[in-house]
Regions:
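Hydrophobic transmembrane alpha-helices and their immediate loop junctions
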Residues: 1-232
Length: 232
């Protein structure tokens, strides 16, 4: 997404369906910081923070598996990395790479998250309707999985590079305007990311506000690199 992230001796490595997965240690730190408000709540505490981290890890892994498995289906061996900005499924497009396949791979991540959302909410309400009394931590895990996969799935479809919505926007723009489609995708990304950053900051949602502020700046930098100068 933003260049290669150097491996460390503390990386967690494993594979899923033959797809290599690497988890950078900063992934855990950022996930913990995002859920640190649980520590200030006397009714919650450390166990609920661990539930949050586990739900973030599982949700992002499923999301990236959506991308990776689709790329693998088309014959392009993928690998997954989870790091401080979330996750990324990497692969080298080969013969047969088309705009429609690019869009399909980009959408497969959010689609996997939405499918997980559907399974989790169906299981959660099914258990409750059956009269099953869930342990508070289990109930909290269901709640967090629903929240993460719905909200992150929707946010990730915003047309801001390098989010999946930005990739889809870029594919559409370059298909319609081969000469300057990347520039139009970056223009759209700057405007949307800037607006979303201001919205989150106005709601005192600092982490997503700063994240989209960073994405706005990143799109601006890429735009300048394409143009050679900052003019529109």
């Amino acid at each position: 997404m933003f260049g290669q992230i150097a491996p460390t001796e503390f990386d967690l490595r494993f594979s899923v369906f033959g797809i290599p997965v690497r988890v950078h240690p900063l992934f855990w730190l950022v996930a913990a910081l995002m859920g640190s408000n649980t520590l200030s709540n006397p009714d919650l505490g450390a166990p609920y923070l661990f539930v949050w981290i586990a739900c973030v890890f599982f949700s992002i892994l499923i999301h990236e598996l959506g991308h990776a498995l689709t790329a693998k289906y088309f014959g392009w061996p993928p690998e997954i990395m989870l790091y401080y900005m979330g996750g990324v499924a990497m692969f080298r497009p080969g013969v047969g790479f088309t705009t429609s396949r690019s869009i399909l791979i980009s959408f497969a991540g959010p689609a996997a998250g939405f499918m997980l959302f559907g399974v989790v909410i169906a299981a959660w309400f099914g258990l409750k309707n059956a009269g099953v009394v869930l342990h508070p931590l289990v109930d909290d895990a269901f709640r967090k999985l629903v929240y993460i996969n719905l909200i992150w799935g929707l946010v990730n479809l915003l047309p801001v590079l390098p989010l999946d919505g930005g990739r889809i926007c870029e594919s559409v723009c370059t298909s319609l305007r081969p000469r300057d489609g990347e520039l139009w995708a970056l223009r759209i990304g700057m405007i949307v990311a800037g607006g979303v950053a201001l919205l989150f900051l106005s709601l005192s949602a600092m982490y997503p506000g700063f994240l989209f502020g960073y994405l706005c700046f990143s799109n601006f930098q890429m735009y300048q690199a394409y143009k050679g100068r900052g003019s529109w």
